[in-house]
Amino acid sequence: MDPSQNPNIVHATTIISVRRGGHVAVAGDGQVTLGHTVMKGNARKVRRLGREGQVLAGFAGAAADAFTLFELFEAKLDKHGQLTRAAVELAKDWRTERRLGKLEALLAVADKETSLIISGTGDVIEPEDGIIAIGSGGSYALSAARALLAHTELDAKTIATEAINIAGDICIYTNRNVVVEEL
C-alpha cells in the first residue's frame, strides 16, 4: 500500500540486507510516519533475534502489523532455532489459521547463510542475489546497494548504511538516521 493512501496508518520505512565477504548486514532508517507527518525520527526497526542474536531482522509496513509479525516470527525462531525452518513454519500457520489474516508488513531476516523476506500474507521469498530491500525507499536502496557491490570493495555494513543514506535523500518516508546490525 502506498503510504499516502491511508493517512491514519503508521508505516513507511526502508530496510536493506546486504551480503559480502561472508558477512551479512541489515540496516534501516529511523523515521516513523503517520500519514504525511513525521512522528519520530529515531525508531529502531532492525534487531537481533534468536537465542544468541544469530538472526538479524528489520521490518517495514504498518507498525502494529510489523510488531505482530516480529513476535510471531520470533516465537517460531525460539521454537525451531533455525531461520528457514522458522519462516516455513510461520508460513504454514498462515494457511491454517484465519485469525492471522493479512498483515500490512514485511520482515527482512538474515542469518550467516540465508536471507529471506517474510510477508504479512504468509509468503517467504529468498532473493536470488542475496540483497533484500523493502519499504517505501526499497527501490532506491536496492539500486544503490547493487551499484556499490558491483563497483566498490566496500564491506556489507558500509554498503547497507550508504544504501539507506541514499534512499533517505530521495524518499520522503525515509531518513538518514541509520541503525545497522552485522553478522
From Swiss-Prot:
It is found in: Cytoplasm. One of its GO terms (biological process) is proteolysis involved in protein catabolic process. Na(+) binds at residues 168, 171, 174. GO terms for molecular function: metal ion binding; threonine-type endopeptidase activity. It comes from the Bacteria. SUPFAM superfamilies: N-terminal nucleophile aminohydrolases (Ntn hydrolases) (SSF56235). InterPro entries: ATP-dep_Prtase_HsIV_su, Ntn_hydrolases_N, Proteasome_sua/b, Proteasome_suB-type. It catalyses: ATP-dependent cleavage of peptide bonds with broad specificity. Its EC number is 3.4.25.2. Allosterically activated by HslU binding. Coiled coil: none annotated. One of its GO terms (cellular component) is HslUV protease complex. A double ring-shaped homohexamer of HslV is capped on each side by a ring-shaped HslU homohexamer. The assembly of the HslU/HslV complex is dependent on binding of ATP. Belongs to the peptidase T1B family. HslV subfamily. Protease subunit of a proteasome-like degradation complex believed to be a general protein degrading machinery. This is ATP-dependent protease subunit HslV. It comes from Xanthomonas euvesicatoria pv. vesicatoria (strain 85-10) (Xanthomonas campestris pv. vesicatoria). The lineage of its organism: Bacteria, Pseudomonadati, Pseudomonadota, Gammaproteobacteria, Lysobacterales. The gene is hslV.
